[in-house]
């Protein structure tokens, strides 16, 4: 037993299972990129990256160049695509560390081209096109049309012709692939496919075409192309309740846990926590547990959420504090200081998922797992071995 106040258990065997299961949904020639940005969605970027690469992934996706450099510093040599913007003055790092940089506009690509030619180098890039996400990328959208606007094709061709850049890939990102209604996703894919055809017709084919995120990987096999980008699904969480979960069995990789710090009997009419917003309706037993909003437990769960104690669901009562939270354990016998408490995960056959917490907060599981803060140790389990990252 560890002595942590709160900790996240990461099942690396579950990550391995998920990556292999997702790769099995694709054609053999289709590569899988594991998205490990945001510290591996809170699970640990380097730890997840290593397991993903051993389990069927052949490339990694990060948001920022410093994440890519961290992976390189940990000895990871696989292709890494930086999905976000990087200032052109960091060109030397891109080249020296063999990174692939996303470019999203002609002006951005021109700046990177000038920086690369100034040092006599070539930077590998993937061109991103916006087909309906409204975020990064060359805008291809003409409202009411599924064909890309002509200016977008010209801009893309201009990027591909720049010196100092090796345009290895072109990609887009779906806004609604996790919806049961695929109308918007289909329109995006049509724009993307047409743009690719026009690039090819102009004599500028691109080797690596990718569009599918986790949701499209599961639900839209026609979008798999040369590579898929798996994010939330490699961590065992489905992109939404609307994707077809029958197509792949995922295993949640993270459990978030804490311990009982104090147990106290209280009478009816007893007020709990800041603001005295909760009053006990009858005599009961409170357990004070060593987790709070500084650990990533959202304060909006105050008097709304549940945790598991001895395999029983018990309610959070009163406002969540920075470091502590109170539970009503009056219905659970023999609760004691030091008992394990599960915020999400399994205990004695009971389960609370990150999705359940997300639903209570009117958000998504992505936010739940990435919100767990750096002061929470990650405890890694892989087969019979375990390791801790503080």
UniProtKB/Swiss-Prot annotation:
Pathway: Amino-acid biosynthesis; D-alanine biosynthesis; D-alanine from L-alanine: step 1/1. The keyword Isomerase applies. It comes from Desulfosudis oleivorans (strain DSM 6200 / JCM 39069 / Hxd3). This is Alanine racemase. HAMAP family: Ala_racemase (MF_01201). GO terms for cellular component: cytosol. The keyword DNA-binding does not apply. SMART domains: Ala_racemase_C.
């Amino acid at each position: 037993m560890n002595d942590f106040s709160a900790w996240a258990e990461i099942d690396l065997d579950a990550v391995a299972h998920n990556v292999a299961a997702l790769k099995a949904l694709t054609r053999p020639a289709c590569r899988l990129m594991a998205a490990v940005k945001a510290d591996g969605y809170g699970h640990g970027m380097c730890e997840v990256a290593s397991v993903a690469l051993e389990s069927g992934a052949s490339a990694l996706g990060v948001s920022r160049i410093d994440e890519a450099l961290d992976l390189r510093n940990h000895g990871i040599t696989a292709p890494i695509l930086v999905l976000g913007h990087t200032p052109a003055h960091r060109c030397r790092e891109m080249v020296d560390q063999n990174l692939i940089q996303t470019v999203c506009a002609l002006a951005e690509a021109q700046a990177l081209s000038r920086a690369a030619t100034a040092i006599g180098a070539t930077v590998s890039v993937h061109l991103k096109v916006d087909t309906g996400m409204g975020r990064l990328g060359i805008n291809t959208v003409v409202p009411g049309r599924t064909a890309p606007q002509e200016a977008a094709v010209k801009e893309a061709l201009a990027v591909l012709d720049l010196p100092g850049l090796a345009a290895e890939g072109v990609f887009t990102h779906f806004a609604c692939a996790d919806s049961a209604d695929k109308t918007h996703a289909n329109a995006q894919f049509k724009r993307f496919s047409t743009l690719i055809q026009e690039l090819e017709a102009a004599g500028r084919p691109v080797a690596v075409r990718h569009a599918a995120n986790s949701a499209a990987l599961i639900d839209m096999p026609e979008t798999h192309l040369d590579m898929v980008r798996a994010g939330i699904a490699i961590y065992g969480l489905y992109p939404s309740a609307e994707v077809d979960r029958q197509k792949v069995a995922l295993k949640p990789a993270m459990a978030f846990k804490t311990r009982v710090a104090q147990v106290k009997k209280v009478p009816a009419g007893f007020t709990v926590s800041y603001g005295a917003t909760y009053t006990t309706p009858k005599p009961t037993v409170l357990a004070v547990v060593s987790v709070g909003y500084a650990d990533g437990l959202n304060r909006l769960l105050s008097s709304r959420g549940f945790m598991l104690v001895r395999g029983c669901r018990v309610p959070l009562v009163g406002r969540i504090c920075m470091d502590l939270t109170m539970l009503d354990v009056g219905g659970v016998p023999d609760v004691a200081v030091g008992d394990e408490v599960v915020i999400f995960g399994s205990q004695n056959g009971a389960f609370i998922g990150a999705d359940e917490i997300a639903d209570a907060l009117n958000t998504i599981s992505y936010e739940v797992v990435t919100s767990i803060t750096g002061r929470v140790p990650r405890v890694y389990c892989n087969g019979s071995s375990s390791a801790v990252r503080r």
